[in-house]
Structure formats: C-alpha cells, structure tokens
C-alpha cells in the first residue's frame, strides 16, 4: 500500500509475527478483532479476550499508517536523524514494513522497519487500544524520560514522539514511537524439555528459543538489580514500580556467551514515601532503601512459566546475583550505611521484615502465596549472602 509522506511514494506493508506473508485485504485476519491479554488479580494466569470496543487488525494497521504519514512524520524524522547522524536534512525512507509483534496487557506494539538506502532502521510503535493502556502510556512516557537520566546510555528506549489517532468509529488510539532494540528478546522461566528442570528460556524469534546457562541466568538477575537500583532515587524514594518479569519488561541479547540487558518499559516512576517541605530525613531515606532492596530480592525471583503460565519462583542463584547488582549500583557511602543496618538483623528478624513487604508489594494473590511459600528458605539464603557481603565487602 503506497502513501506519500514526503516527495515520493513510499510503500507500507503489513505483517503479523508468526504468520507468513503480508496482511492485507482479503487476508482472513484483516477484519478479525485484535485479541487482548488482561490480568485478573484473582486469576492464576492472564486471560485473552476481544477488545471492547472492537478494534480489528484492519483498524489497527490503518491507524498506524495514519500516524506514520501524518502526526508521526516529525517523530520519524527525529528518529532517523538519531540513527543516521551522517545524513543531513529531511530523510525519506525507501519503504516501510509494519509488523504487529504481540498482544500485550497494555499495548499492541508494532515494529516499524524502514529502508533508507542500504541502512535498515527498526523502531517500535506502541499502540494502546484500551483505557488501561492509554492511562499506562501517559505515565510511561514521563517515566522513561526521567529514568533515562539515571541509567547508562542506551539502557532504555528513547521516545521520539506521541500522538492520538482516530480509529474506526472515532475511537482514540494513542501511540508513541521509540527505539527498537534489534536482536534482543524476551526471556522467561520455563521447563527445559531435555531434563525436566526449570531454567530460563530466551524467545529468540530470529532463530529458535534457547535456554541460558546458570552463569548467564545469574548475570540476568544481576543486571536487572543493577538497572532498577540505578533508577532508584535515594533522595526522593522514586522508583520504577510496578515491574514484572512475566510482562517482558526486560529483554536480552547474548553475544559471545555474554548477556546484554535492556529495560523497555517503565509504567510508573514515583516515590514510595512523601516527606514534608524539608523532605525526608536520613533515617527515613535509609529505611526506604532497605524496603526497596528487600522487595527487589523477592520480585526478581518471580515470573510466570513461559510468560503466561503458572507463577514461578527462580532458583537460589538469583539471590546472590540480585545482591551483587544492587550494591554495585549504589554509591559507596550509601552502600556502607545500608550494610550497617542489615548487619543488625538476625536470620529470624529478616523473615519478620520480609513478611509485610511481601504482603504490601504482592501484585496478585497467587504471587503472594508463592512468596510466602518460599519466604523462609529465601530469607535464610539471603541472610547467608548478606553475611558474606558484610564481612567481606
């Protein structure tokens, strides 16, 4: 389907991951509704259901085309200029492919692949088709911009622009354009068919799914803890929350056996404590950091099997890796202060502190049950790891 965003015609073609060929009339999927994934706090797994109001694949692709050729044109130019700094002036792609990648809880992201000469530029266009998605998008765009200032460059996607496009029946479809991390994939706890044990599988859509080694798994948990702790503001207690491995908030790439991690979402970035006009005192900030750390040791171990199955609890290797990543991200003085506080707690006291944290931050009843079932061994393992860190920092 050719359109004219600039001087010449540019062909835009549509695809859906998992389906062969291009999607256009009279393809049987063209007029079928988009599925959605919703999470019910009472349920053990996500549920798939049709959208209300109904948005078809045709509605979706037409809205994306309207964005790319209308309100999104300056956003595309900004992205192309960032990706091709050697090119000057306006850059017109030779062609585009729009690939509907997945049906998420909040967004239906499309990968927008543009050919510019010999270069191929991939971007992501996150599209919200529900009220929950729209509300999440407004919060996330603000969060990503603030979090990016605290993280190493390239750790989170750059947002190039946002617009609301009218779909069928004048339904408003908000969407924003951002970086696509090429070669990175979702990962989840999964049962390895070779030995029947639990491992971590990478959904490599370019080749084939594969399982990580234990060393690579530990590196994943270390980097997750490092990025979330770097994003945490100890002065204000601002942090990324909620986040969840089951939602695919982090993605990874393995090169020469080394793991590279990216954070691709930040649904909310807000403080957990509110101080008076003078702000929080040092004791309050230290206690807030303690709560953040202990919650991180729990949440970093939670996933769903294959992303959508039963709640899953990681192997103990995640504990030492989480502790390592956390302390690597902290300034030395703050790390020393927290180690002093943690050193005052015994094994039983650690369980007493973790219990209300698990109750407060558990997102779903099934996850709370999972945490409480594993709380005693988790606390014991965490205590042993902390003793090693405190006495041999």
Regions found by a protein language model. Give the residues of each.
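Helical subdomain adjoining the active site within ATP-dependent kinase catalytic cores
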Residues: 5-33, 302-393
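ATP-binding glycine-rich phosphate-binding loop
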Residues: 8-14, 18-119
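N-terminal low-complexity, intrinsically disordered segments
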Residues: 85-101, 135, 139-182
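ATP-binding glycine-rich loop module of kinase domains
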Residues: 97-99, 103-149, 209-213
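The N-lobe alphaC helix and its flanking beta3-alphaC-beta4 segment of protein kinase-like domains
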Residues: 133-150, 376-392
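Conserved structural core of kinase catalytic domains
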Residues: 158-219
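Conserved kinase catalytic-core segment
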Residues: 208-243
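Catalytic activation segment of kinase domains across protein kinase-like and atypical kinase folds
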Residues: 239-309
